[in-house]
């Protein structure tokens, strides 16, 4: 199991959710991929 600190906690590293991005950062465990960061707007 891949354990990452917020905001890098995702149910699956290969299944992005239709969420707001803020911003696109390099994939923590795969430099060749990018992953949307969950925008924490309250």
Swiss-Prot record:
In which broad location class does this protein mainly occur, judging by the first location in its UniProt entry?
secreted
Compartments annotated for it: namely:
Secreted
- Where does the entry say this protein is expressed, by tissue? Hemolymph.
Among the GO biological process terms of this entry, one is: innate immune response
Induction description: By bacterial infection.
- Superkingdom to which the source organism belongs: Eukaryota
Q: What are the entry keywords?
A: Antibiotic, Antimicrobial, Immunity, Innate immunity, Secreted
Which GO CC annotations does the UniProt entry carry?
extracellular space
**Biological function:** Antimicrobial protein. Has antibacterial activity against the Gram-positive bacterium M.luteus (MIC=8.6 uM). Lacks antibacterial activity against the Gram-positive bacteria B.circulans, L.monocytogenes, S.aureus, and S.lutea, and the Gram-negative bacteria E.coli D31, E.coli ATCC 25922, and S.typhimurium. Lacks antifungal activity against S.cerevisiae, P.pastoris, Z.marxianus, C.albicans, C.fructus, C.wickerhamii, A.niger, F.oxysporum, and T.harizianum.
Please identify the protein, giving its name as recorded. Answer: Proline-rich antimicrobial peptide 2
